[in-house]
Curated annotation (Swiss-Prot):
Keyword flag Nucleotide-binding: no
One Gene Ontology term from the biological process aspect of the record: cell adhesion
Identification of the protein by name: Outer surface protein A
One Pfam family matching this protein: Lipoprotein_1
Residues annotated as signal peptide: 1-16
Topological relation to the membrane, as annotated: Lipid-anchor
Assigned protein family: Belongs to the OspA lipoprotein family.
Protein's UniProt keywords contain Signal: yes
Lipid modification (N-palmitoyl cysteine), residues: C17
Keyword tags: Cell outer membrane, Lipoprotein, Membrane, Palmitate, Plasmid, Signal
Originating species: Borreliella burgdorferi
Lipidated residue numbers (S-diacylglycerol cysteine): C17
Compartments, record wording: Cell outer membrane; Cell surface
Top-level division of the source organism's lineage: Bacteria
Amino acid sequence: MKKYLLGIGLILALIACKQNVSSLDEKNSVSVDVPGGMKVLVSKEKNKDGKYDLMATVDNVDLKGTSDKNNGSGILEGVKADKSKVKLTVADDLSKTTLEVLKEDGTVVSRKVTSKDKSTTEAKFNEKGELSEKTMTRANGTTLEYSQMTNEDNAAKAVETLKNGIKFEGNLASGKTAVEIKEGTVTLKREIDKNGKVTVSLNDTASGSKKTASWQESTSTLTISANSKKTKDLVFLTNGTITVQNYDSAGTKLEGSAAEIKKLDELKNALR
């Protein structure tokens, strides 16, 4: 009898080692940090199906899943009180996470992709599951917001917000973002392609003497000229700020030091 009970105890112990994700804790799992400030618990042992159990809690919803890997990657799912579904997908190399909320019938409501560099893309969908809004936050904290979207490549409204709250407004057409700021007859435009490449230009509709500008991609510098003389450089830094520096009266060399533009009015003043 003792041997029998011992055998039963051993079997139960083995089952406990192979139990499902609902019982994961700090003793039988490892916590893995994934992009988005989330943690995924990964079982130390494989379950009866030869996979690692996964568990995470997102917005008070318990998500569960399994994976062939023990690094935290995989797909986890859970259900909210209103029966909508939450799905978390962690990339194999842990480089990004995709968090989705879906209706009970599977229609997507929202999606947020977070990369390791903390850049994010958040998308919202209408009742039919069609893309309607999208916000992209770069690693430097600047944003691109799209609304009134008809598909992934077209939006009636686009707003880019750089550091210091400086906003450029425009639209998204055929995958290219075109946003601008106007001051009098001068328009400062930023064009952003699908790969994130930025081109800055200036257009002046004045009837008399017009300002012109040349863009140097390698230094992200827009050199503005008037009456065939260079007047100032606008530099769009990688941290999301803009600086301005004036040329001497001859327009041959920069003088003083570059100053950070901290207000929209300061940028508009630089365009005058």
